[in-house]
Curated annotation (Swiss-Prot):
Gene coding for it: lon3
Species name: Sorangium cellulosum (strain So ce56) (Polyangium cellulosum (strain So ce56))
Protein's UniProt name: Lon protease 3
Family: Belongs to the peptidase S16 family.
Lyase keyword on record: no
Swiss-Prot/TrEMBL induction comment: By heat shock.
Length: 830
């Protein structure tokens, strides 16, 4: 029943009426929308009954909160739609099924009654219906957008799209579309219902549909991806089932083999002794492996990982020997000389025998090539009953070589440490890290940093390899490292090691090594054990002097091997086994022309030529220094492939000489009239300050035009005050002097403590003069009649003859001068 006041409104004036209200939960009925509702609340059923009595019209409005069972006027939106009941059916359970069609928008004016049911008075909302090109374009855009939505949302029937495309009224188009968008939120639907202008309603509708389209497109992609994955999984399952059926027909095949492998792993896990962490890891990986297909790539990775853990020697040890007498016998049997080194090794083994632990410094053998560093490590392994394993670090630049690759990488493996321990089969071998000074660094990491943990006794019991990702105990491993020089080893790594220097062998030691070890070994390797072959001492000396230039004996063995091969050929060709003696004069026939000129002293005393001493990569050597003076303007030139340190030493020598011109009897401005050139022959890089006294002597000899003794060599750093400072490598330098035929060696007094490292045979063959000042060097070296008058008597000079200390330094008669050369005078009072 409608109450209309026609006198108050015109033709298009809004209607007003009083009708029952039906509160709706989670649904909004739009005009032109037919909805089927199930009504169960008593007040709502009463409202329907009243509507049937009032001409079947009812007001439909949504609740603000769907969970409210007994709403009040404040719980109901103020805008809804007036609808007509098309059909009403009472169900057996008391529920009423009703079919209602929305007719027009309306706003609640007031509540007339709210007791048994809601009775309200409403005002109709009159919509503007202005037709324009803009509205027409907007309608087309809405229809096009809805078409896209329908294509993505398969729940909407195609007939709905056809009906929407036939609508030519903006308001009805908007209401029809919103009625068919079930995913739009209730608040957005209510807002569209309250919009009076169709144009704004269409614009908002486009925004909502575009947002829904984006969501539907993402859902479509997800469904497509899931579908493909399911199809792939189903396909794999189907193929696997087929494969299993085929294998079953053929007698089990791969699956049975896979089961056998798992059983073997389970049995090995029961018997293998390993850490609790490792056992738990194997069980976890085995559980994963059982769920995998045998031929999958992941199964192969897991199997390899389990194999590595099971094959490592977690608690497998070699039986160790602590017999020092036997250890000393083995060291003496394998190596000649090296007395100090052997004593240190025996001390190391004695401490281990008492403590039964390896905690202590790691030994680092430093020395030139071929002196026996690697073979010493092998002898230690033999003496202690441990197995021996060697890892060369030369050229290693990747941290993963030490720590391994993580399992995420294809083809990942443990580091070389773990690989070597698996190969050797015990967890207490003698582990030689060879050429530790030859490692380098790049973008993949610093292997030297990775070794810090390995060589630290406080940390290596929990060494963690990246591949295993487990703690492995390295504390029982006896690590030994080798290097040619300390310069290539980082300081933190040096701090974890005890450095043992292995100097070069003397000529006497090389002779004995050749006779006792090298010649017998090469005779055996060349099949000459039954042939009477003898190397004379002269032949071996010739090979040492003219065919090798090294501190060790590696090249010496190669040359002996070359002689033995030529002898073997001669024996096979002649078919006779006559005694063969290799003598000095026959060596060029076997080895060709001499390769090296022995670093020996000159045959004449010459001006500006001084024998210096140096340490090279192959041991000690004579380092002759030449100085010459030419007319010029005081320029100093130093040549000979020198490093910066040696050039600075040359400038210091020149400054000292200039400060002593008056004492030397030279004009004060003589250096301004001449250029001085100091040269060090031989194309070998030279560095260090130990040639300071050599350059001072060469400069003074050239400026004074006084010759230097040819049978004398010297070494020492100088200061601007003329003090002679200590140097390094004394043993190697004295070996070189002895080898080069030098009779007297001048060296810093502060190096007296280092003489204990020099072989007794060498000390007895040399006269040693230990000085503190350059004046003592010049007095001893220059062949000068009035040397004592110029440089004064010796002060604090020590002299060794035949290896014994002489209380006072006595003058030594210089070697006979060549024809036409001055003869040195005896000192005053002699």
């Amino acid at each position: 029943m409608f109450f209309k006041n026609d006198s108050d409104r015109g033709k298009n004036a809004p209607e007003r009426g009083i009708v029952p209200l039906l509160p709706l939960r989670d649904i909004i009925v739009f005009p032109h929308m037919v909805s089927q509702l199930f009504v169960g609340r008593e007040r709502s059923i009463a409202a329907l009954d009243e509507a049937m009595n009032r001409g079947k019209e009812i007001f439909l409005a949504a609740q603000r909160n769907a969970k409210t069972n007994d709403p009040t006027p404040d719980d109901i939106f103020g805008v809804g739609s007036v609808g007509a009941i098309m059909q009403l059916l009472r169900l057996p359970d008391g529920t009423v099924k009703v079919l209602i069609e929305g007719k027009r928008r309306a706003r609640i004016r007031r509540y007339v009654q709210s007791d048994a049911y809601f009775l309200i008075e409403y005002d109709e909302i009159v919509e503007s219906s202005v037709a324009s090109v803009e509205v027409e374009a907007l309608m087309r855009s809405v229809q096009s957008t809805f078409e896209m939505y329908v294509k993505l949302n398969k729940k909407i029937q195609p007939e709905v799209l056809m009906a929407v495309q036939a609508i030519d009224e903006a308001s009805r188009l908007a209401d029809t579309i919103i009625a068919n968008l079930p995913t739009i939120k209730l608040t957005d639907r209510q807002a569209l219902l309250e919009m009076e202008e169709p144009q704004k309603r269409l614009e908002r509708l486009i925004e909502l549909m575009q947002a829904e389209i984006e969501i539907l497109q993402v859902e479509k992609k997800i469904r497509s991806r899931v579908k493909k994955q399911m199809e792939k999984t189903q396909k794999e399952y189907y193929l696997n089932e087929q494969m299993q059926a085929i294998q079953k027909e053929l007698g089990g095949g791969e699956r049975d083999e896979f089961k056998n492998e798992i059983q073997e792993i389970e049995e090995a896990l029961k018997t293998k002794r390993m850490s609790k962490e490792a056992a738990a890891k194997v069980k976890k990986e085995l559980k994963k492996l059982k769920m995998m297909h045998p031929t999958s790539a992941e199964a192969t990775v897991v199997r390899n990982y389990i194999d590595w853990i099971l094959e490592l020697p977690w608690y497998d040890k070699s039986e160790e020997r602590y017999d020092l007498v036997e250890a000393e016998r083995i060291l003496d049997e394998d190596h000649y000389g090296l007395k100090k080194i052997k004593e240190r090794i025996l001390e190391y083994l004695a401490v281990q025998a008492l403590t039964k632990k390896l905690k202590g410094p790691v030994l680092c053998f430093v020395g030139p090539p071929g002196v026996g560093k690697t073979s010493l490590a092998k002898s230690i392994a033999r003496a202690t009953g441990r197995k021996f394993v060697r890892l060369s670090l030369g050229g290693v630049r990747d941290e993963a070589e030490i720590r391994g690759h993580r399992r995420t990488y294809i083809g990942a493996l443990p580091g070389k440490l773990i690989q070597s321990l698996k190969k050797v089969g015990t967890n207490n071998p003698v582990f030689l890290l060879d050429e530790v000074d030859k490692m380098s660094t790049d973008f993949r990491g610093d292997p030297a940093a990775a070794l810090l943990e390995v060589l630290d006794p406080e940390q290596n019991h929990t060494f963690n390899d990246h591949y295993l990702d487990l703690d492995y105990d390295l504390s029982d491993v006896m690590f030994i490292t080798t290097a040619n020089t300390l310069s290539g080893i980082p300081v933190p790594l040096q701090d974890r090691m005890e450095v043992i220097q292995l100097s070069g062998y003397t000529e006497f030691e090389k002779l004995n090594i050749a006779v006792k070890y090298l010649v017998p070994r090469q005779r055996k390797e060349c099949g000459l054990e039954d042939v009477s072959l003898d190397f004379t001492e002269g032949a071996l000396r010739t090979i040492i002097h003219h065919y090798t230039k090294e501190s060790g004996v590696r090249s010496l063995e190669r040359e002996i091997a070359s002689v033995c091969r030529k002898v073997a050929r001669r024996v096979v060709s002649d078919g006779k086994e006559k005694p063969i003696e290799v003598v000095a004069k026959s060596i060029p026939k076997y080895l060709g022309v001499p390769k090296y000129r022995l670093g020996r002293r000159e045959e004449r005393d010459e001006v500006g030529l001084v024998n210096g001493l140096a340490v090279t990569n192959v041991g000690g050597d004579l380092l002759p220094a030449e100085a010459t003076v030419v007319p010029g303007k005081g320029k100093l030139v130093i040549t000979g492939l020198l490093e910066k340190g040696m050039e600075e030493s040359g400038h210091a020598a020149m400054s000292y000489v200039r400060s002593r011109l008056d004492r030397l009897g030279l004009e004060a401005d003589v250096y301004q009239k001449v250029d001085v050139h100091i040269h060090f022959p031989d194309f070998v890089r030279k560095d260090g300050p130990s040639a300071g006294v050599t350059m001072v002597t060469a400069l003074v000899s050239s400026l004074m035009k006084v010759p230097v003794r040819r049978d004398l060599a010297m070494t020492g750093e100088i200061t601007l005050r003329g003090r002679v400072m200590p140097i390094g490598g004394l043993k190697e330098k004295l070996l070189a002097a002895h080898r080069g035929g030098i009779a007297t060696v001048i060296l810093p007094k502060e190096n007296r403590k280092d003489l204990r490292d020099v072989p007794r045979r060498v000390l007895k063959a040399l006269r040693l003069v230990l000085v503190e000042h350059v004046d003592d060097v010049l007095r001893e070296a220059l062949i000068l009649p009035d040397a004592y008058a110029i440089f004064g008597p010796p002060k604090g000079v020590l002299e060794y003859r035949d290896g014994e200390l002489v209380t006072e330094a006595a003058p030594v008669k210089a070697p006979p001068a060549a024809a036409g050369e001055p003869t040195p005078a005896a000192p005053p009072g002699a």
